[in-house]
Amino acid sequence: HMQKLMKSLIVAFAYMSMPIMAQKTDLVNPIIGTNGMGHTFPGACAPFGIVQVSPDTDTIPHNIDGVYQPRAYEYCAGYQHKDSSIVGFSHTHFSGTGHSDLGDILLMPFTGKLQINPGTADNPDSGYRSRFSHDTEISRPGYYEVLLTDDQIKVQLTATERTGIHKYTYPADQKKQL
């Protein structure tokens, strides 16, 4: 019995002294491909899911008065890492398609005055968009988080196969609006 106990203790000690192995999902960086023409999004989705809840940093129309807008192509997945403001968080994105599509069901939390237009990237104060910093951005498989700095709203996103889930944490002394 003593030999079995010693073998068990040695195996247990060896197992406990092994470095903790990273989960495979810890090795994934969803930010890769979100700049330039990578056409990927940093938000949350589940494998084979029908929703991909993610931030949209701009909405450039394909054409204005019948004239094609080349910059629309940059926003195929709705997000460009180079941008410093967010227009909202939508539930449908394609990754790597090279064609602008989806971006449906856009939600944007805010405090203060209701604004109908998104404004421009050059002048975020001209609409409802909010500035953000990549320093507050967390993107990992199935989860996205960012702080909207204009209204100090913490946004957390996750997804199941059929549902996009948003959690907004507003400043305690501000009116909560969506």
What are the functions of these language-model segments?
Residues 22-178:
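Accessory carbohydrate-recognition regions in carbohydrate-active enzymes
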Residues 1-23:
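Bacterial Sec-dependent N-terminal signal peptides
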